[in-house]
Amino acid sequence: MTMPYYASAEQIMRDRSELARKGIARGRSVVVLTFRDGVLFVAENPSTALHKVSELYDRLGFAAVGKYNEFENLRRAGIVHADMRGYSYDRRDVTGRSLANAYAQTLGTIFTEQPKPYEVEICVAEVGRVGSPKAPQLYRITYDGSIVDEQHFVVMGGTTEPIATAMRESYRADLDLEAAVGIAVNALRQGGAGEGEKRNVDVASLEVAVLDQSRPRRAFRRIAGAALEQLVPAAPAAASESAPEPKPDTETKPADPQD
């Protein structure tokens, strides 16, 4: 008689967590940060059709890493949730906290009840109305439904530690848009590079958008083309190109003739 296969609940949760983390680690990184006029999204995304950054509602934005089909389902569900709440009550009742809580409940349920968890990590950002003293809000929601109210910036994706370190060293309050883009792009260039080296992250591989608090209704807008080229700092020159060629210490002299 064969014994039935048994795995403890702890082992099952551990395996699901490992699966989700590996899937997220394969994704390219995203940086979300607050700046003087609202919230900035900067994502590594060479695709012009499949977006990792999107609008959710009037003052809400969305960013995600992981499996595209899974976070796209979450994005669409969030838009429907926000539209229904705004239609049933009032547009001002649609807040980042309520939407982040809805995402957390959905991901938590999927993680515990479904055979496979979602391999995603998402960020919901919110800015206040024009003239409101309310500070921008950033909510990070992970694959198991955990939710964290982040301060200043969020880093998601594969190689997060060097990017987060660069952000902590460079970030400061009251950044303007150009400075915020420069800090985020330079931080992304640290991901996956060796010690003291920077990757080449050019404009064509970036997806950039902002939640602009000064806009009267829909705060979300994308930045692309020439406008983005003016904001992105130049890529660092390769060491081989910048270093001068070494010169010989002594000049070679012809050998003396033999007698």
Swiss-Prot record:
Gene3D superfamilies per record: Glutamine Phosphoribosylpyrophosphate, subunit 1, domain 1
Pfam families: Proteasome (PF00227)
Stretch list, region Disordered: 233-259
Pathway named in the protein's UniProt entry: Protein degradation; proteasomal Pup-dependent pathway
Localization, UniProt: Cytoplasm
Reported regulation of activity: The formation of the proteasomal ATPase ARC-20S proteasome complex, likely via the docking of the C-termini of ARC into the intersubunit pockets in the alpha-rings, may trigger opening of the gate for substrate entry. Interconversion between the open-gate and close-gate conformations leads to a dynamic regulation of the 20S proteasome proteolysis activity.
One MF annotation (Gene Ontology) recorded for this entry: threonine-type endopeptidase activity
Cellular component per GO, a single term: cytoplasm
Alphabetic keyword roster: Cytoplasm, Proteasome
One GO term of the biological process aspect: modification-dependent protein catabolic process
Matching CDD domains: Ntn_hydrolase
Biased amino acid composition, Low complexity: 233-243
Bias type Basic and acidic residues, positions: 244-259
Assembly, per entry: The 20S proteasome core is composed of 14 alpha and 14 beta subunits that assemble into four stacked heptameric rings, resulting in a barrel-shaped structure. The two inner rings, each composed of seven catalytic beta subunits, are sandwiched by two outer rings, each composed of seven alpha subunits. The catalytic chamber with the active sites is on the inside of the barrel. Has a gated structure, the ends of the cylinder being occluded by the N-termini of the alpha-subunits. Is capped by the proteasome-associated ATPase, ARC.
Function according to Swiss-Prot or TrEMBL: Component of the proteasome core, a large protease complex with broad specificity involved in protein degradation.
Family: Belongs to the peptidase T1A family.
HAMAP family, per database record: Proteasome_A_B
Record-given protein name: Proteasome subunit alpha
The gene coding this protein: prcA
